[in-house]
């Protein structure tokens, strides 16, 4: 790369994926000064932008509030992948926040590369898919400007931001996001190695999965578990099962399955296997 990367260059961000996390990230980026293009799949019926628009409206109604002032929603423009993906050429940073499936993310990145301008920062909010796999097959410029930027839900309130370089990520990109996360986004940036589930989810998902198995073994109720694993032991009032609802049970299962398949020799690999009752809820 020949052009230095400076924080003032982040004026417009494309958020690809308007689910719970994508919409909340879009809100946080808007309230920290960026214009945001929020894209998702087009609707099969009715207005094509309705999936992104509906998700953003739902996010604005959620608690805790994703914006400290609703006036910042004016900085967010909704669109769809069919009509508006070419507009990522106008953006300084592209962040992918779609479903936790490697094949679907790779398909989207293939489409993104057709429109992304060289030198544009591109990241993934993946919860645990290896960054090296996500960027496989992409151009050298793409890989040099690509890394993981893993926010935690709700992104306005949780300070942790994991920065995960890929094998070819330029050091200046890493340094930029470490600084930008703290000085602009108000995060505590943590540099992670590209290991399965990185740091927080490797520990957190293990703890939740181990508890899932204990619940099954002891026949505990959801209410009892959340009463015991919340403020009573110094944890947030969302405790365990309510935290899973916030994070998304499907996301948790994807991360756990990823660790199980990528770490077969881990001494506690059995803990990452999904109990039947959890899989039933996802199905």
Model-identified regions with their sequence ranges:
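N-terminal glycine-rich phosphate-binding loop for ADP-containing cofactors
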Residues: 1-283
């Amino acid at each position: 790369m020949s052009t230095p990367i400076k924080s003032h260059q982040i004026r417009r961000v494309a958020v690809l994926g308007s689910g719970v996390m994508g919409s909340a990230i879009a809100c946080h980026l808007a309230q920290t000064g960026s214009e945001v293009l929020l894209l998702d799949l087009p609707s099969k019926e009715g207005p094509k932008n309705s999936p992104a628009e509906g998700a953003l409206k739902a996010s604005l109604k959620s608690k805790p509030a994703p914006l400290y002032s609703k006036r910042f929603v004016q900085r967010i423009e909704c669109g769809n992948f069919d009509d508006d993906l070419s507009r990522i050429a106008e953006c300084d940073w592209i962040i992918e926040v779609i479903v936790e499936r490697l094949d679907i993310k790779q398909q989207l990145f293939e489409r993104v590369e057709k429109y992304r301008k060289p030198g544009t920062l591109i990241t993934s909010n993946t919860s645990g898919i290896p960054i090296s796999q996500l960027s496989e097959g992409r151009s050298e410029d793409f890989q040099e400007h690509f890394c993981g930027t893993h926010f935690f839900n709700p992104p306005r309130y949780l300070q942790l931001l994991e920065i995960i370089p890929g094998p070819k990520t330029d050091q200046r990109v890493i340094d930029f996001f470490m600084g930008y996360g703290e000085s602009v986004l108000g995060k505590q940036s943590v540099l992670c190695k590209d290991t399965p589930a990185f740091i927080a989810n490797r520990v957190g998902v293990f703890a939740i999965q181990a508890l899932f198995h204990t619940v099954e073994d002891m026949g505990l109720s959801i209410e009892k578990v959340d009463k015991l694993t919340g403020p009573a032991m110094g944890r947030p009032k969302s405790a365990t099962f309510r935290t899973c609802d916030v994070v998304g049970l499907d996301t948790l299962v994807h991360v756990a399955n990823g660790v199980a398949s990528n770490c077969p020799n881990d001494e506690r690999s059995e803990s990452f296997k999904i109990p039947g009752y959890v899989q039933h809820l996802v199905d």
